[in-house]
Amino acid sequence: MVGLAPIKVIEDLREQVRVTLQTIESHLQTTMNIFELTRTLISIPSISGDEKAVAVFLADHLSALGFQVELQDAAEDRPNVYAHRGDPDVVLSTHTDTVPPYVEFREDAEFIYGRGACDTKGIIAAMIKAGEALIESNVTDFGLLFVVGEEAGSVGARVANSIPNRARYLINGEPTESKLALGSKGALRAILRARGRAAHSAYPEMGESAIEKLLDVLNDLRRVEFPRDETLGATTMNIGMIKGGVAANVIPPEAEAELMFRVVTSNDSLKRIIEGVVDSRAEVEYTFGCDPVFTERIDGFNTTVVAFTTDIPALTNWGKPLLFGPGSILDAHTPGERILKAELARAVDVYKQMVVSLKASWS
């Protein structure tokens, strides 16, 4: 008759099995290919303000890959993720947040679809896989920085700028159609508020229409030839929102418009132009602004310029900036957001080679 195994032996066996299963699970997690990793990231919603779940996943995943990982609270329950090998002189960076609404993952033979596919869950995946390839090539002293809130004022980047580092170069990832961006336009958001005097619409002479005052100001702004830059092109203005009035039979006492300028010169110079046109006809409130950015070049790349803004203006302490990423900004923020699988796969090697090239350029 065979004796029963001691209880401690059984418990030890159970623990060994548990550890083995955890090891297998960790291995499966860390050996995800670029498309599997992108799918996993898209499946974790991270609309601006709710990035914690994807940050926790990234921290666990990067720790399992052998990175030293730091979580930095940019705001309550909104952690930035900084992962590094050694003391980085080159850092790959992009953002974890997306715009609303959430769009579920799907794919076909050519494309991956879903919220963040190109802006920027796919780019996160490409940067991580590039990091794996660098580790396999025994490259050290590089890092990955994934920040919250790029889509809503760059709060994560502004807080991450305080992380002590000695980085010489920052490779920022945004969808540039796999071209090296030579620069990106700045932005200036303004609210114009016109004041009038309410009256019965049958007696308009007794009132003053705030809407008509506002329309006059907007028409004058539309006729302005705003500054141009040889590289970035023209400053543009979008009248994004207009509201005002009480009812059709009331002379409107208040009206306002929200404008977004894509800027190729300094915000200060553009503000002087705006205020000169508006004069005293309306109040002007500036709610957001960042100057244009001119980025570094690397030989051998097709180049472009982009009209959108990035986290680069807020990451001034992370070295000289570069801007590159797979995917098209024209697909970002749309119901059919997507990224081409072949382009995403190529980006892994491009990011790796960029890190190697930049490290060699100054060593």
Task: Please provide the spans of the model-predicted regions.
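Extreme N-terminal basic, low-complexity initiation segments
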Residues: 2-7
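N-terminal helical capping/dimerization or prosegment-like subdomains
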Residues: 17-91, 99, 254-260, 272-276, ...
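Metal-dependent amide/peptide-bond hydrolase catalytic core
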Residues: 46, 53, 73, 175, ...
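Active-site metal-coordination/substrate-binding segment of hydrolases
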Residues: 86-146
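Residue-level marker for buried hydrophobic side chains located in beta-strands
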Residues: 90-92, 171, 197
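Acidic/histidine-rich catalytic neighborhood of metal-dependent amide-processing enzymes
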Residues: 125-189, 229-230
